[in-house]
Amino acid sequence: FLNNYKDKRIKMASDQTLDIIARNGGITRDELNDILIPNFEFGQDRTRTFDYGERKIKAKIDIMSTPANIIAYDEEGKILKGLPKASKKFNDVESAVEEYRREVKYIKKQIKEIITEQSSNLLRALFLERKWKTKRWIEIFIKNPVMQEFAVQLIWKETDENGKLIKTFRCMDNG
């Protein structure tokens, strides 16, 4: 998220602040970065419901598309071209709908940036042979709908306390 600022002083100050937070929390900067990945109010099943007033629009993060996308569904489950505009026919709350549409546009942009950044972070983790405790791994890669992209696309290995390989595995798209 630091890439959102053009002013290098803001980037540096943000970076230094995050380093301090990690140090004070007794964790590495990479561990803090894992924790800070937002879920954008989407559930573990990658869905979120937008309340338009009398109707509800369901949205789902499609992590398997390139780039990752958000697919909208009407109440019957029909795929929509995007989050629909407010409609008087359905008595939609126009202000809420417009806010949702802006939010989804922002989320799509953020997900793209997160995936790019996390791809680099995970490549570094691979070279450094970084390890996650099972509980933390589940929190980061299974429960966070944005990070599920990596859970399903990578082959993971489980090791014992001594680093001995127990098994390799791959997560399925349904978590």
Which positions does each model-derived feature cover?
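Non-catalytic terminal/accessory regions
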Residues: 1-175
